[in-house]
UniProtKB/Swiss-Prot annotation:
Keywords: Amino-acid biosynthesis, Aromatic amino acid biosynthesis, ATP-binding, Cytoplasm, Kinase, Magnesium, Metal-binding, Nucleotide-binding, Transferase
Purpose: Catalyzes the specific phosphorylation of the 3-hydroxyl group of shikimic acid using ATP as a cosubstrate.
Organism: Nostoc punctiforme (strain ATCC 29133 / PCC 73102)
Cofactor comment text: Binds 1 Mg(2+) ion per subunit.
Listed name of the protein: Shikimate kinase
Enzyme Commission numbers on file: 2.7.1.71
Gene behind this protein: aroK
Localization in the cell: Cytoplasm
Length: 181
């Protein structure tokens, strides 16, 4: 697998609550890669929580910071990177993401809702109609998420280990070994 990937980063994309930050370290371990949570890097770099950044900078300001951090992170190799759910919204981010292998973790809204119903740390979810907000965000982002190299549909009851193993199994389908002449 390592020879097939040749150090190329893996970027996990998808809605908040799909398990990118949980699956990412497992995937990294399988590959002998490092793991980065982009939101964690942003929080550390700015010394502010994501909620604080949204409150102080607005979504547009946060998205700019996110792009700046992504541009720096993509210079490294052998990383599995969990991105924020909105990383796909800015065209410039796709230029960075395409330096690696993009994996979309696709989880049904019902399951995301159950995972996030009690979560007060997500700035885009401070909405009375949480399920409606999730549906709306997913509808808006699905055409963008679908540009990923790999589309992993997560089923109810699948463990993070199951998901990581499925990703490992399908990576060879999108990466062809370099032909030796």
């Amino acid at each position: 697998m390592s020879s097939l990937l040749q150090g190329v980063n893996l970027y996990l994309i998808g809605m908040m609550g799909v398990g990118k930050t949980t699956v990412g370290p497992l995937l990294a371990k399988h590959l002998g890669y490092g793991f980065l949570d982009l939101d964690g890097v942003i929080a550390k770099a700015t010394d502010k929580s994501i909620n604080q950044l949204f409150a102080e900078e607005g979504e547009a300001g946060f998205r700019q910071i996110e792009s700046d951090v992504l541009s720096q992170v993509c210079a490294f190799t052998k990383l599995t990177i969990a991105t924020g759910g909105g990383i796909v919204l800015r065209r410039e981010n796709w230029g960075y993401l395409h330096h690696g292998l993009i994996v979309w973790l696709d989880v049904p809204v019902e399951l995301i809702y159950r995972r996030l119903a009690e979560d007060t740390t997500r700035p885009l979810l401070q909405d009375a109609d949480l399920k409606g907000k999730l549906r709306s965000l997913l509808e808006q982002r699905t055409p963008l998420y679908s540009q990923a190299d790999l589309h992993i549909t997560v089923q109810e009851g699948e463990t993070p280990e199951d998901i990581a193993n499925r990703i490992i199994e399908v990576i060879p389908n999108v990466l062809k070994p370099q032909a030796s002449h």
